[in-house]
Every structure is written in C-alpha cells, then in structure tokens.
Amino acid sequence: MIFASLIREWKELSRFRALEPRLRSIVFYAEDSSSWTYFEPMVRELTGALGKQICYVTSSKDDQILDLHEESIRTFCIGSGTVRTAFFLSLEADVMVMTMPDLGTLHIKRSKESVHYVYVYHSLVSSHMSYRRGAFDQFDAILCVGPHHKEEIRATEELYGLKPKILIEAGYGRLDSILGFEASLPSHFTDSHSGTKRVLVAPSWGGNSLLENHGPELVEVLLGTGHHITVRPHVMMIRHRRKLLGRLQQQFGPN
C-alpha cells in the first residue's frame, strides 16, 4: 500500500516535470484540501481575467481540486514525504504560492533554481506571536491580511537585518468569501426575529487553544443560552486531536 502510493507520487512528479516551462510558470502548493479556500479567489482571477495557466500541487489524495477538470488548472498529488521534498528542491517555476510557513527552516527548502516564493496567510493572527521565528524570512513576497502584518514584518526585517520583502496589502480572501456567501443566502437564513442566534465556535489549535483547554465547559455554557451552536475545529486539530473531538461529539452530538 505504502509502496504503491510512493510510486503514484513519483509518477505525478514526473508528469509535472514533463510540462513545458510556460505551463508550470505559476505553481500553487497545498498541504491539504483546506488550502483551496484561500487559493481559489487568486486562482480564479489568474485563470479567468488574466488568462494564465497554473499548476496546483497538493499533498492530499482527498483534495477536491483533483476532481476539478479545467484546461487552465493542472493538478498533481505528491504526498507529504520523500517526493514532496524532491519536488521542492528541484522546482523549476517562476512563482510558487503557498500557505505553509517555515520555508527553508524545516524540511521544506527553497529550490536550487530561481523561484519567486509568495506566502499567503491562512489566518488573521500576528506574524510573530503565533509562528516560529524565521517562519517567513525566506519568502520573497507576502500577501498581508492587514496593517499589523506589514508592520510586524518590517520590524522583524529591521531587527534582524533581513532583506526587505515585497509586501502586498491583499486583505483576507476567506473573509470576503464568507461575506459574499452570506449576502447570497435567502433572508430566512439571516433574519433573527425568533431571537435565536447561530453561534460559530472556530478556534485555532494547539496546547493553548480554546477547545483543548475549555472545550466541554464552553460548549455546555453556550448550549445553555438556547442558541444554535456549531463547533468547527481547526483542520490540524482534526488530524492530531481526534480523541478529544470524539469526546466532544459523544457528549454534545445529540444537540
């Protein structure tokens, strides 16, 4: 099973490398299927209004993008092991766009070739309070969610004597999508004449996160308000804290 997956991933890498340079000029890399949420507005603008060809490389075999058959979007699945490491080291492209930080500081390195690396934030949080030191140092350009990112990155560059990056005030595409979706809903989904509100609990993950420290107590208190409560755990929590989520589901699932 593992060997068969590895063979498929190497074949995918070979298929990518066989493309003409113009067809792999712009590459998006996704750690998992959730990355599409942040990439889609950019991909649609590039392939639609600008008429560009892009490659979308994912580490998840369950990524919905693999079922997307569009002439201007070529998809590849390279897994998250040896093949991915080889892909990054040997990448030949003009631009690589990714939501994964820590480029060059852990196992994912910059290519030996000349590639322009662009980082896209997948959250609104601070760039230095929620990430490792050096998480963004090796990117060439960063799409900033807000002024705090721009200020923090410039301060970091000055403090450590780093080469200035291209900082683009891009906003948060995910929030734009949510607001656009809400505007498209029928009025009975958004009106709250009954007094019952829809409360979404969608915190981050990790040892200090809200659900890991106060999950059951929080949900119990919120349910006591009589409102409709939805708990949406972080994708990394789904991956690494399944037992905790299972307990929450068992305790509050019927609600």
Describe each region flagged by the PLM.
Residues 1-25:
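Membrane-proximal basic amphipathic "stem/tether" segments
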Residues 255:
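Active-site donor-binding acidic/aromatic loop of nucleotide-activated sugar
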Residues 13-22, 45, 87, 110, ...:
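Short boundary motifs at domain starts and secondary-structure transition points
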Residues 35-51, 55, 173-251:
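Conserved catalytic-core segment of nucleotide-activated headgroup transferases in glycan assembly
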Residues 2-11, 135-211, 235-238:
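A nucleotide-sugar donor-handling region in carbohydrate enzymes
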Residues 8-11, 117-123, 187-189, 215-217:
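Short, functional N-terminal and low-complexity linear motifs
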Residues 27-180:
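Active-site and donor-binding regions of nucleotide-sugar-utilizing enzymes
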Residues 22-25, 115, 196-199:
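Nucleotide donor/acceptor-binding cores
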